[in-house]
Amino acid sequence: MNYFNNKNILLIICGGISAYKSLEIIRLLKKSGSQVKTILTKSAKEFVTPLSVSSLSQEKVYDDIFSADNEAEMDHISLSRWADAILVAPITANTISKVASGNAEDLASTVLLASNKQIFLAPAMNVRMWEHPSTKENIIKLKNFGYKFIGPEIGDMACGEYGEGKMS
């Protein structure tokens, strides 16, 4: 976590059972002196609430590419410029696929495509999803684009299975 000390970190939280771990990540980043802004995907809000995230980050939670708060501001550009680094934890197979194919349909994927900052991805998914040929191809693409992967780990999963796919 030393890389993330005393920096502006944009944390993107995708939808998956591991999303609850992002709350601890926010706490650790803040403890290390970093400022943390967050983006929640639509499905992430099924696992963690904007209130929990904003309470820990002490910042507004971003979740919509078309924000009614300030129509003149382009959140995907301003957030990308603000961040020293971007951490996506957890990142799902769906978001990996979106970014690898250049799909920019929501705020999270748009920020990732618009950024020239270092981007770290912490995958979390079922072992069969992690091992699927499409996922493997997309991971190779993203690594070639310069994205850094953190994990996943091998272990027991929420679905009751064991294997590689746990968020590190």
Language-model features and meaning:
Residues M1-F120, N126-S168:
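A cross-family phosphate/adenosyl-ligand binding-site feature
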